[in-house]
Amino acid sequence: GVSEGFPFDETTLVFKVMGKIFCIADLEGNTGIALKNTPEKIMEMREEWPCITPASHLSHIHWNNIGDTFTIPATLLKSWIDDSYHIVVKGLTRKLQEELKNMPYSSNEQIE
């Protein structure tokens, strides 16, 4: 269900679930990571954290860029990544959701 790759360039790691992007990470550390969320949560995150801005080249309504991930507590960052994953899964077709649900996972691949 989850894959990772470099579809844009050699320093931008993209995570997908069933072919749909849920996380984009700049491995050089220049722009941080981009995550999807609900429009309400997007605005709340931007108001609370100065390092969070609208994501470049993505819908500003649904995507945030977290510029300095080191200022965010690790548990909160993990929670936002999980939220992004689940929002994308919720937007999948029923058929793809069913395929994902029925996929076997090894212990190190499972996403909670």
Mark where each language-model region is.
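Charge-dense, helix-prone N-terminal extensions
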Residues: 1-112
